[in-house]
Swiss-Prot record:
Native source organism of the sequence: Glycine max
Keywords for the protein's UniProt record, in alphabetical order: Nodulation
Domain of life: Eukaryota
GO biological processes: nodulation
Name of this chain's protein: Early nodulin-36B
C-alpha cells in the first residue's frame, strides 16, 4: 500500500476514506454511504471468490478492498444527494 508521509502514517486508502467520510457526515449521508459500501464489498468478495475458484480450484480470502470501490460508493451517494436536493427544490415550488 502507498504511504502518505512515513511508515507510521495511515495508508492513502485510509486517509481518503476518512476525508470522504467526514464530507459525507457534513451532508448527512452516512447511513446511505455505509449501506452502499457494504453492498460493494459483498459484490467484490463474491467476484474475487469466483475468480479465485476458477483459477486455482479453491477460494481464497483477502482482507482489503480496492480504493476504486470506495470512490464508486462515494459517487453513488453524491448522486443520491443531488437527486434528493433536486426533488426538494422542485417540491418547494
Amino acid at each position: 500500500e502507498e504511504r502518505v508521509l512515513t511508515p507510521h502514517t495511515p495508508s492513502l486508502k485510509t486517509v481518503c476514506f476518512g476525508l470522504a467520510l467526514a464530507s459525507l457526515i457534513n451532508k448527512g449521508c452516512v447511513l446511505t454511504f455505509f449501506l452502499e459500501w457494504r453492498k460493494q464489498i459483498h459484490i467484490l468478495r463474491r467476484r474475487r471468490g469466483l475468480a479465485t475458484a476458477w483459477q486455482t480450484g479453491k477460494s481464497q480470502k483477502r482482507q482489503w478492498t480496492p480504493l476504486g470501490s470506495l470512490w464508486l460508493c462515494i459517487a453513488h451517494v453524491v448522486l443520491l444527494a443531488v437527486e434528493c436536493n433536486n426533488k426538494q427544490s422542485w417540491s418547494s415550488f
